[in-house]
Each structure stands twice: as structure tokens, then as C-alpha cells.
From Swiss-Prot:
Entry EC number(s): 5.4.2.10
Listed name of the protein: Phosphoglucosamine mutase
PTM (free text): Activated by phosphorylation.
Species of origin: Lactobacillus delbrueckii subsp. bulgaricus (strain ATCC BAA-365 / Lb-18)
UniProt keyword annotation of Nucleus present: no
């Protein structure tokens, strides 16, 4: 179990948990680990960017100081989306990238996430190596001086390359679709107008004026209420919401209904399959994807491979087996023909492309997708990882699954961050599904409760 790194880098309340001192150490130790084996022996180059949080510049300066102290050349991108940084690391042939962002988390939090030269998140082994250096009592890393120190180069115009990359994935303009776009007052805010105007989109924006404090504040992919209202009010055909670092996209249909990552993947995947472009006729998702998603895919002859929770695991499965589409219910969608990580703006563009190519509304494109009612209860327990050792809990799950008779599913898993056991079920009706969950929760509470 890693001490500092979670499922998406190092995160915590800025200046309290994630301090400038920690950012310096992460820059110094992380930079060393990622560039120590540079084959040509030249100076290593690392791209650094951030989202729009007020704490971003504080952490950025500390992080960059750490990188410079081990002789790394830093290309400073300023405000950039996480997928944008991932793309630029590869496009520039850099040795690594570091994004300062806490994604969809509130403004109090921030995070530091490393990418390798391939634009992908680090392996657990690399993160463990960085942690070991951070916790070493005496810092024995190199301390170059004079010409051996790193330098900083302004690379804010890298955003132009990223916007051009996104535009090049779309073969035609996207005129004829009216869309409302929510930038979450985050990293995408500065790029939305330029990108969508270049593609002749009829669009309006909300939450695209970051002030350092309003990122994800009742806006963006995790708070779509205002976007839903605006889509209906403006008579738009579509709404798109990104999160703070724009690695996820949630949509809204013409009636104001939220459309999550499962539904977005169904629309894009169905279109790709119809045109022979969905590799191995398979979509990769996590275990959290709705059973209705799998059933809808089956009716179209598309397979669904599932991984544990986390877009990293979806990405690994896709690369290992050559799949072209995958993602999470939360809106992380990976279209690997274009990018190897979840990209909210890329996803939104390709959802619009399907709507234009088919001439259908989002409601029409989703007509065959019938979502199963889902109930999720978080149960406080003494030891979240021991549930399989409690026979009464296992028996309760088996009993519910037997009663479901294939028309539903149960998923029990420990929380990744808290001492909770998550009990989730999907079934034919909300009432029946609630009853299934209640039966399991009762036994879990009795056997494992605090």
C-alpha cells in the first residue's frame, strides 16, 4: 500500500496536506526517478502544467524548484488540461510531465500527478520508488551547480498544438448542432471558445471564468443542474460538462437529462462498430458500469470487458489487448485511436460528430439503452478488506444473487480511501433493488460494523 500516492497521484488539502515542502520533494525525487536513466545522457526535459486553483501557482513554483535542483529543464505550460499535458509530453518528445490538479475535487484540494514519456500515468513500482526517496532520512540525490542546474522555458503556446490536435481528429465542421458547454471554471475554460469556434459549432458557455476559487463550484461534470436548465432554456440539442482538469465529460440531452460515461460510450461505440472501427467489437469499462449498458451492447453484438475501478486499469486493459474504446461511468472516456488517456473535450467532439453523421438526437441514439435501477450504500466497518472472510456476508450475497436469477447484479467492494464497504446492486425495479441491498447491508453491519 502506497503512503502518498493514491489512484490518481498525490492529493490532499493544499498547504496543509499537500504543502510546498512536499511539492518540492515530489519534484526533486520524482524528477530524479523519471529521468535518471535518460539514454542519450543529455539534459532531461519535463513539462509542468496546472489547473485554475488558487493553490496551483504556489505548488507549481515549489515543484519546479525541485525539478531544477536535479538538473532538469522545465517547460512551463501554465494552465493546461490533464489530457492536454499528456499529449504534449508525447508530441514534444519530453521525458516526463507533471500536472498540478485535483480534477473534480473542491478548490481546497490539489494534487500532483506524474506522466512518463509515453504520456501515461506511472506504474505502482515507479510511485513506490519515489516514495522511498521522499522518506529517506538523508537526501543523497545529486546537487548540481552552475551550468548543471535546470532551467525554465515558457511553453504556454503549447496549447496551440493541443487545440490543433483536437481539431485534426474531426474530419468535418460540426455546424448544425446547438450546444451549451460548462467549463467547470477549470483548465478547459481558456480553450473552449477557440476550439468550438474553429469547428463552426453553434455554442454558448457557462462557468468559463475562473477566479482561482470557483473551480468545480456547483458546476462542471459533477454538478450538472445549471447546465441541464440552460440546455432546455436555450433549446439546445446537447450540453457538455467538463471537470476541473477536463479529463472527463458528462453530457446532457435535448430534454435536460444527464448522460453519463456509460451512455456516451454506448453512442460512440455503436457508431464505431457500425462502421467497422471498434476494435475487436469490444468496449472496456470498470465494474461500476450499469448492467443495462452491457445488455444494450449485447443486443448490438458488442462485448463488454470490465476492470477494477480506476481509469488507469481501463487504459492498461485497452493497451494490453488492443481495444479502441473504454472508460468509466464518471465520464473518463478513452478513444485510443486518437489519445491514450481520458480527454473530456475530445470525447465531447466525437459525441457531436456521431450526432451530425447520423442526424439523430441524443435521445434517439440512446433509445435502446435501458438503465437498470441502482442502489449503493456505504457501510462503516472495522476492517473493509476482510468481508470475504465473513461467511454470513458471503451467504447473504449468494442468496440475493440467487433471487436475482440473472436479472440483476451485486457488487461489494472496499472503499479506496475510507474504512467503508460499498454495497451496490442493480435490479429490475428501484424497490426490489433497495430490498436486495438492505438484506446485505443488515448482515454486513451485524458482522463487521464499527
Amino acid at each position: 500500500m502506497l503512503k502518498y500516492f493514491g489512484t490518481d497521484g498525490v492529493r490532499g488539502e493544499a498547504n496543509k496536506v499537500l504543502t510546498p515542502e512536499m511539492a518540492f520533494k515530489l519534484g526533486r525525487m520524482g524528477g530524479y526517478v523519471l529521468t535518471k536513466e535518460k539514454e542519450d545522457g543529455g539534459q532531461a526535459r519535463v513539462l509542468v502544467s496546472r489547473d485554475t486553483r488558487i493553490s496551483g501557482e504556489m505548488l507549481e513554483h515549489a515543484l519546479i524548484s525541485g525539478l531544477l535542483s536535479v538538473g532538469i529543464e522545465v517547460l512551463e505550460c501554465g494552465v493546461m488540461t490533464t489530457p492536454g499535458l499528456s499529449y504534449l509530453v508525447q508530441a514534444q518528445g519530453a521525458d516526463a510531465g507533471v500536472q498540478i490538479s485535483a480534477s473534480h475535487n473542491p478548490v481546497e484540494d490539489n494534487g500532483i500527478k506524474f506522466f512518463g514519456s509515453n504520456g501515461l500515468k506511472l506504474s505502482d513500482a515507479k510511485e513506490e520508488e519515489i516514495e522511498e526517496l521522499i522518506d529517506t532520512k538523508q537526501d543523497m540525490l545529486p546537487r548540481p551547480s552552475a551550468e548543471g542546474l535546470g532551467t525554465v522555458t515558457d511553453f504556454r503556446d503549447g496549447s496551440n498544438k493541443y487545440i490543433q490536435f483536437l481539431e485534426n481528429t474531426i474530419p468535418e465542421d460540426l455546424s448544425g448542432i446547438k450546444v451549451v458547454i460548462d467549463g467547470a471554471n477549470g483548465a478547459a475554460s481558456a480553450f473552449i471558445s477557440r476550439l468550438f469556434a474553429d469547428l463552426d459549432v453553434d455554442f454558448t458557455t457557462i462557468s468559463t471564468h475562473p477566479n482561482g476559487l470557483n473551480i468545480n463550484d456547483h458546476c462542471g461534470a459533477t454538478h450538472t443542474a445549471r447546465l441541464q436548465e440552460e440546455v432546455v432554456k436555450q433549446g439546445a440539442q446537447l450540453g457538455l460538462a467538463f471537470d476541473g482538469d477536463a479529463d472527463r465529460c458528462i453530457a446532457v440531452d435535448e430534454n435536460g437529462n444527464e448522460v453519463d460515461g456509460d451512455h456516451i460510450m454506448y453512442v460512440i461505440g455503436s457508431y464505431l462498430a457500425d462502421h467497422g472501427r471498434l476494435k475487436k467489437d469490444t468496449i472496456v469499462t470498470t465494474v461500476m458500469s450499469n448492467l443495462g449498458f452491457t445488455k444494450a451492447l449485447e443486443r448490438r453484438g458488442i462485448k463488454n470487458v470490465r476492470t477494477q475501478v480506476g481509469d488507469r486499469y481501463v487504459s492498461e486493459e485497452m493497451r494490453a489487448n488492443g481495444y479502441s474504446l473504454g472508460g468509466e461511468q464518471s465520464g473518463h472516456v478513452i478513444i485510443s485511436d486518437y489519445h491514450n488517456t481520458g480527454d473530456g473535450m475530445l470525447t465531447g467532439l466525437h459525441l457531436m460528430l456521431v450526432m451530425k453523421k447520423t442526424g439523430k438526437s441524443l435521445t434517439e441514439l440512446l433509445a435502446d439503452f435501458k438503465e437498470y435501477p441502482q442502489v449503493l450504500v456505504n457501510v462503516p466497518v472495522k476492517d473493509k478488506n476482510s468481508w470475504k472472510n465473513h461467511q454470513a456476508v458471503v451467504d447473504a450475497i449468494d442468496s440475493v444473487e440467487k433471487d436475482m436469477a440473472g436479472n440483476g447484479r451485486v457488487l461489494v467492494r472496499p472503499s479506496g480511501t475510507q474504512e467503508l464497504l460499498r454495497v451496490m446492486a442493480e435490479g429490475p425495479t428501484q424497490e426490489i433493488t433497495q430490498e436486495y441491498v438492505d438484506r446485505i447491508v443488515k448482515v454486513v453491519t451485524t458482522e463487521m460494523g464499527e
